[in-house]
Amino acid sequence: MTHHFLKKTAGLIRAIEPLRLIRPISPIGRAGLFLMAWCCLMTLTACESEDYETGDDEYSYMRADFVEARSAEAKSLAHAITDDGDSLVFDDHLACSWATTADSTYRALLYYHVDKEGSNHVKGISAKQVLVLRLPAKRTKSTPTDPLAFESAWMSTNGKYVNLGLNVKIGKTGEEDKKQALGVVRDTIVALDDGRREHRLRLLHDQNDVPQNYSSKVYVSIPMDGFDPGDLILIDINTYDGPLTRTFEVTPL
């Protein structure tokens, strides 16, 4: 089981204040599918436990995992499954303003403390929303590729997602309708000689004239359940340093 161990510091998880959501990002619904293909960037607030305190004792250190978190009721997370397949149960439900639908599953970067080694009962500390970008059912009319800053790309351990760590440039505009957006489209499908297919995807980014005063971190996940094991996924990303491509092989779920 792989975890990232982090020390809690003031301001570790902060909101992206100037970015707002046009409508709530759909969770994985009861049917088990993400419903949204194009996501508008929002105030990516990290839900945080109010009674968690900073300091240098053992509770200052926490684990961080990308998860599918389940809401018991609106704005409250009850349990989660990590990308490593570990089941986590929160001692107390984690209040989470962006998890707006009851009995639904959300993608998140979860910070938590384990009660004791070998136990799946944990204290939820905070949950940062991860944007889920699913391929649209049909070609979108607008496919902007405004540049952004690329940090990392990796396949989830369970093979369910390709994940991207990005930095977007943001700034206050004073206009409510100035919202950035991220999305993904598929440009080509190529049949390979060995029977597999190569899917070329393109990351979309609409800056929408939002001022580029400073950077803020955003994580996105692209579900792999629509592809066959062995297929190749190429993702083209337009960055401030020029275009780049990251390649992944789909693994069995």
Where do the PLM segments sit?
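Short helix-loop boundary/capping segments
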Residues: 152-206
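Short, solvent-exposed, Trp/other aromatic-anchored flexible loops in extracytoplasmic proteins
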Residues: 204-233
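C-terminal motif of bacterial Sec signal peptides marking the signal peptidase cleavage site
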Residues: 43-46
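Flexible glycine-rich surface loops and low-complexity tracts that mediate binding to linear polymers
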Residues: 100-120
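Structural detector for short beta-strands of small beta-barrel domains
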Residues: 51-75
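Surface-exposed beta-loop interaction hotspot
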Residues: 116-167
